[in-house]
């Protein structure tokens, strides 16, 4: 009995430095036993196993990079008093629809008279569609005519609008008559249209960034009356919506590129 008491007194000092280990139940403390002899008696001393913290290696951290982030789904009705995610979604969708409309009206292999209808002309009275101030017709398979006799004062503005329409057109003027030669369907022409499609897609992405920035700025105004966790969650939702829209824009560009290159 006496020898048993003596053996527990001979605890290693390191044991006393682990206060956290002492506060846990004995069943949770990992003990290490060391045997030895003192005064002719075999004695055993108990030492707590030193806790080891395993840090992530650089290789493990690198492996985690590039992994898809967990998606969030915010109940739009619950945050309506903070920001209307429905309106943000509609604004982002309008960017996509504008690009699709641009692709359909201006980027076609063969230019038809209808392609010129909605070209916007800047006049002294404001912006108007070309078909509202000029009579558009097909003179031949190679030439489109725009008769500006009804609004001769807008002829110069119409020529400028056609040239800057992004359709790779080079109009020629004869008095109030604008001749628009239709580009030949060459490989160079196709590649030019693809280049314009990329430019229009980049403009759409710029408009999308403006929508995202406006939404984030609106959200910041609610930081004083909304918890940080809620703000961060909504920010993540908005960023996620923007990323999804970018992916959709890229899909439309890929489809248009395939169509144009044949």
Curated annotation (Swiss-Prot):
Subcellular location: Mitochondrion
Cellular component terms (Gene Ontology): mitochondrion
Pfam families hit by this protein: RRF (PF01765)
Key word Mitochondrion present: yes
Keywords: Mitochondrion, Protein biosynthesis, Transit peptide
Organelle targeting sequence: 1-55
Gene Ontology process terms (BP): ribosome disassembly; translation
InterPro entries given in the database record: Ribosome_recyc_fac (IPR002661), Ribosome_recyc_fac_dom (IPR023584), RRF_sf (IPR036191)
Domain of life: Eukaryota
Position of the signal peptide: none
Predominant place of localization: mitochondrion
Task of the protein: Responsible for the disassembly of ribosomes from messenger RNA at the termination of mitochondrial protein biosynthesis. Acts in collaboration with GFM2. Promotes mitochondrial ribosome recycling by dissolution of intersubunit contacts.
Stated family: Belongs to the RRF family.
Protein name per Swiss-Prot or TrEMBL: Ribosome-recycling factor, mitochondrial
Lineage: Eukaryota, Metazoa, Chordata, Craniata, Vertebrata
